[in-house]
Amino acid sequence: MDNTIIIPYSDVESKKEWLWKYRMPHKNVAFLYGSSEDAVEALIAEIIACVSMGRALAVDNMSRQAGRVIYQNFKDGQIGAVKASLERQKADCSNIAYVNFNHKKAMECIQELEKAIAEFQPSLVVLRNISQCMEKQKDLYDPLKMAPILHR
């Protein structure tokens, strides 16, 4: 063979950081979908509770420090229901916040969210029912448009 060198991947150091090992990358965009709103809400609440308390996530023994979370539900009237879900999971609600947009337009909401992320420095940002405030739903599914906001 010429100068070809074969290196097995077992010899390569992984550079991926995980929020939830092998399921949810750290500082990346992840989408959770499900046919049951209750099941999706329960999973989100469990993930947020683990991050807020510094607990390991299911099937993941990674130790972590407690982190902050912005949990933004864009559906009107959900704040009380969200808090109840978080309390059921024994989340540390002092590490979890939402941004009060006061009926602002989509672009203003994005700007407010950017400011909140910069100020609060969350380990995790959860955007629920975001399609209700997006002018173009396709933007929601374009990681190139959403990721710069979440990577700050």
Mark where each language-model region is.
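N-terminal start-of-chain detector that recognizes signal peptides
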Residues: 2-5, 41-45, 70-73, 98
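Conserved inter-motif catalytic segment of the P-loop NTP-binding fold
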Residues: 19, 62-148
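Short, acidic/glycine-rich phosphate-metal binding loop used to engage nucleotide
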Residues: 10, 36-38, 103-105
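Glycine-rich P-loop/Walker A and Walker A-like loops and their local beta1-loop-alpha1 context
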Residues: 26-59
